[in-house]
Amino acid sequence: MNDLLEVRNVSVSFDGFKAINSLSWSIGYPELRAIIGPNGAGKTTLMDIITGKTKADSGKVLWDEVAIPLTQKSEYQIAKLGIGRKFQRPTIFEEQSVEENIIISLKNNRGFFATLTYKYTDQEKIRVGEIASTIKLTSLLSKKAGELSHGQKQWLEIGMLLSQDPKLLLIDEPAAGMTTKERNMTVQLLRDLSKTKSIIVVEHDMDFIRNLGCRVTVLHEGSVLAEGSIDHVSKNKEVVEVYLGR
């Protein structure tokens, strides 16, 4: 498995506080990876650096086989390269239907209002149907997004990211606020997607991560503390001390 993204000796400080400290880390393609760590460990800052929201003070972030330096790119340019990010709170158009939300997000150069009046092609219709099927919302295409359950809104936003054909998805705390059934369905969705994409999941819910069955990276004080299966890192004495609190 080749690396899709490599973070090489990256550091960043805020007002003297080193949020990321000489961090080196990578994810393969395709791969599902969970990132855990206590508050202030650097999880969000790492995601911000990958997506260009925060610029590193030093080090490199390299993308794909040709090692494109992401630290020299804008957020927009990074997104266009194939990196999509979903925050904890869903960002959807609640007054539009599920179908319209997906259409709006399709990879094209049309604006919001132009998209709503645009008569999309048969190929685009097929793509919308495929995405709806993937996120288990086919029967709800005509429903207003604001009327969906919390879990369904999360899936819709993932579908909106999928419409951009990303190679890497960054998913922030997907399990928060979900019912048990929704959490189980989300686990299956992420596992299915990881067969053809790389996915980074930042999550606090250990049961959710265990069900993902993927490699886990533990961050602490801006560096990698441990990596391996959830069972492996849970037995690491340093991890127990700084994260699990046992």
Question: Where does each model-flagged region fall?
Answer:
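Conserved ABC transporter NBD signature motif
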Residues: 59-69, 81, 173
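Helix-to-loop junction immediately C-terminal to a conserved catalytic motif
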Residues: 51
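ABC ATPase NBD coupling module
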Residues: 55, 68-90, 114-122, 193, ...
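Conserved structural motif at the start of ABC-family nucleotide-binding domains
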Residues: 5-7, 20, 27
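Conserved ABC nucleotide-binding domain
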Residues: 71-72, 131-149
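The feature captures the beta-strand-to-loop junction immediately N-terminal to the Walker
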Residues: 36-38
